[in-house]
Regions:
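Positively charged, helix-rich recognition surfaces that bind polyanionic ligands
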Residues: 2-59, 65-74, 78-606
Length: 606
């Protein structure tokens, strides 16, 4: 079944200058917080409590689902309501307020908590007082995490499951490749796989799949929960490597929580004054919109320059981990939107290929300084123009400039000093990905024990400060690089940007910017996409194939090539080509060739 691609709009201009509806600014919390001595400890305590609550919520959901799966009972519908009920089950609150609609589910969860979860971990419920408006945000975040896990990883896990369970049927990769594609598109497959399909597919795929698995997993991802558990159970019996069917929060460094106006009122406005008289807390909560300006003026320094923005205004919501703070802003022309009404969604920036431009549009680019840009994993971008000016931005450079490497070293030293590594190593014996109910119980006990032993270490402010510092210096590193582009190549430039990209993370390498870096460059400079076909394999001068350079031991040198055709007849010197520089020059030449002649050299045609 062919998937219809969304038709790209005709090229009109390089970028969409329309402003997004929302914007966030990340700054240190202490720079805008009023009455720091009294308010920051309250926020810190809440951050710690909610982080612990979220950790247990992930574990409780997984434990409850495994219990149902093991007993061959219907799995729960994992929506925000179910997650919110799980959160409430793990906490205590008074009996005032609106009762839950599904009392049967609440009672079932409470019973499971009392009989299974609480005795296992000796868990103490979290005090949920003054968190009424915060809990739905936590439920949404957890739901999004679970939802994304299914959408992003089910296909990958399904294909790996096929690899691991079809060894006895065929080892022919081409036959297996066709079988995988036909399975995903729900087409008839080779009869040699009939027994395999009868055994496994009913346990993996839901009924009434629409169009294809690729489409259906996006529409109703939680229908594939049973399949994820089944595949993991089969792999576990085979003693193969497992995947995570339902994610857990294993990192216990406190994370950000969302605070809105109602949450601020609940936290900092007492119900009664010193004399025992009722305050206006109830009145404020019943009329939040009219009082929100007054509330935030008493909580944050609204005279701070961060709030003075020409196009945006503060939208009465923050995210904080007690150290850093993300302020939510809304466009001023949308500030009076009605509750529930939709705001205009800014379309994702289209990166047009050079073939999308008409001859008239190409003619306007002839006086530009063309820059060839080769994106990659280790060298994030390597740029070069026809004058020989070059600029490179590497993953290692970014890691050092953002203090990422320094932070890793400090964390490792402190973990060794406090013997945290020894404690965490003990947990590695257990498997958090197991779907065996008893094995997962053992893991939960060991993980909870470890969390209690290390929680004081990870609650230290230094880890959250380092995370914020890494974010800040990472932005500074990018800004410095963007300014260097102008210094190196001038203002009137057109960047021919190679179309290299990866859809998944490369093994044994750190995560790096790819499309995100392209977006940042494109915001400031005009870029056009160039097909990279053969640009790293053929010489930038003679266009003949390059060969890897080998040392005296016959070992290929990383990213270093030689061109036998460009060797001088007089001195027989070897001509070396570095992969990135060679690609950048080829991309530059392809860009210029299309602008002036609307043709692609024969050697680079596909």
């Amino acid at each position: 079944m062919k998937v219809k691609k969304k038709k790209k709009e005709d090229f009109k201009e390089f970028r969409n200058n329309e402003k997004s509806a929302y914007k966030t600014f990340k700054i240190p919390l202490k720079t805008i917080l009023l009455n720091r001595d009294t308010t920051q400890p309250v926020i810190n305590h809440l951050v710690f409590e909610m982080n612990d609550l979220v950790i247990h919520t992930y574990q409780f959901i997984r434990f409850y689902v495994l219990d149902k799966y093991t007993k061959i009972q219907p799995l729960p519908t994992i929506d925000e309501t179910f997650i919110l009920y799980c959160i409430k089950t793990l906490g205590t609150r008074d009996n005032r307020g609106k009762k839950g609609k599904d009392t049967e589910l609440l009672e079932t969860l409470e019973q499971f908590y009392k009989t299974e979860y609480q005795p296992l971990l000796n868990h103490e419920k979290t005090n949920l007082k003054n968190t009424t408006f915060l809990l739905p945000y936590l439920a949404t975040q957890i739901h999004t995490s679970l939802h994304n896990n299914f959408q992003e990883h089910f296909i990958q896990h399904f294909l790996r499951f096929i690899n691991k369970t079809t060894n006895q049927i065929t080892e022919d990769k081409s036959i297996l490749f066709q079988f995988k594609n036909k399975c995903l598109s729900l087409e008839e497959t080779d009869i040699i796989f009939d027994d395999w399909k009868n055994i496994h597919l009913p346990n993996i795929l839901p009924t009434e799949i629409k169009k294809s698995i690729h489409y259906d997993i996006k529409v109703r991802p939680f229908e594939y929960l049973k399949g994820m558990l089944y595949m993991n159970s089969v792999l576990e019996k085979q003693e193969s490597k497992l995947f995570q069917p339902l994610p857990l929060r294993n990192n216990i460094i406190p994370k950000h929580i969302i605070l809105d106006t109602a949450s601020i009122i609940n936290l900092f406005c007492p119900e009664k004054d010193k004399d025992g008289n009722k305050t206006k807390k109830g009145e404020l909560l019943s009329n939040v919109k009219d009082n929100q300006n007054e509330i935030w003026c008493n909580f944050l320094d609204m005279k701070n320059k961060i709030f003075k923005n020409k196009h945006y205004q503060f939208h009465n919501q923050i995210q904080t981990d007690g150290i850093s703070c993300c302020l939510l802003f809304i466009r001023k022309d949308l500030k009076d939107k009605k509750w529930g009404s939709r705001v205009p969604v800014l379309q994702e920036q289209d990166f047009h290929t050079i073939e999308d431009l008409s001859k008239e549009q190409l003619d306007t680019l002839k006086d530009r300084n063309i820059v060839g840009c080769d994106p990659g994993k280790h060298s994030l971008v390597y740029m070069m123009d026809k004058k020989g000016n070059k600029l490179e931005y590497t993953a290692s450079q970014r890691k050092i400039e953002s203090y990422g490497k320094r932070n890793q070293r400090i964390l490792l030293q402190e973990k060794k000093k406090h013997k945290i590594i020894e404690k965490e190593t003990r947990l590695s014996i257990q498997n958090s990905k197991s779907v065996n109910y008893d094995k997962f119980k053992v893991y939960l006990v060991e993980k909870d024990k470890l969390n209690k032993e290390t929680t004081d270490f990870y609650k230290k402010e230094v880890w959250r400060k380092m995370k914020f510092r890494q974010y800040s210096y990472g932005k500074k590193s990018i800004d410095t690089f963007l300014n260097k582009i102008k210094e190196t190549f001038g203002e009137n430039i057109l960047i021919g940007y190679g179309n290299w990209s990866r859809s998944s993370q490369m093994k044994y390498t750190m995560p790096t910017l790819n499309k995100g870096l392209r977006k940042l460059i494109h915001k400031k400079y005009d870029t056009i996409t160039i097909n990279e076909f053969y640009t790293s394999q053929k010489c930038c001068e003679c266009r003949n194939p390059l060969k890897h350079y080998k040392d005296t031991k016959g070992v290929e040198i990383y990213r270093l090539f030689t061109c036998s055709n460009c060797v001088s007849c007089e001195n027989k010197n070897i001509v070396f080509r570095t992969r990135d520089k060679n690609s950048a020059i080829n991309i530059l030449n392809l860009t210029e060739s299309w602008i002036h002649n609307q043709t692609r050299p024969v050697e680079f045609q596909f």
